[in-house]
């Protein structure tokens, strides 16, 4: 499996943008789902408290998105799914892999006592599912467009249609023509 630096860099950019979209829309989904959970706050308070927790959390979240995007850009073309489905599938795969760790947050996270209960909460699960689906969709579409190959050349109109409007005989195909038996 060869790895292209340019493909990897464009994937990282797509992942960083997708993570930023995720983080920017969190206030809206907190209102929709009724769960005051902020991923950037979770990441930031794992490292520090106070005024720098949220900006640091945004940086960590964006960096994580870039790493995920770089990996995605190199793996996704080999996944046997339609290109439009690869990003959402990757986002949901990450969700399924990481959601069980929310059961450990109250005990292991430095700010665990201050975090809302996520494990066992249907609205929190729905909120996290939405976020991962959004992330995967933005990542997949942006990476696909950034790393798209050259567009196939479309033949000119004159090349496929003759002056009589029916095409060229040279381009006609004959199916089922049987040669007479010479015997």
What are these regions (language model features)?
Residues 1-183:
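Short amphipathic, positively biased membrane-proximal segments
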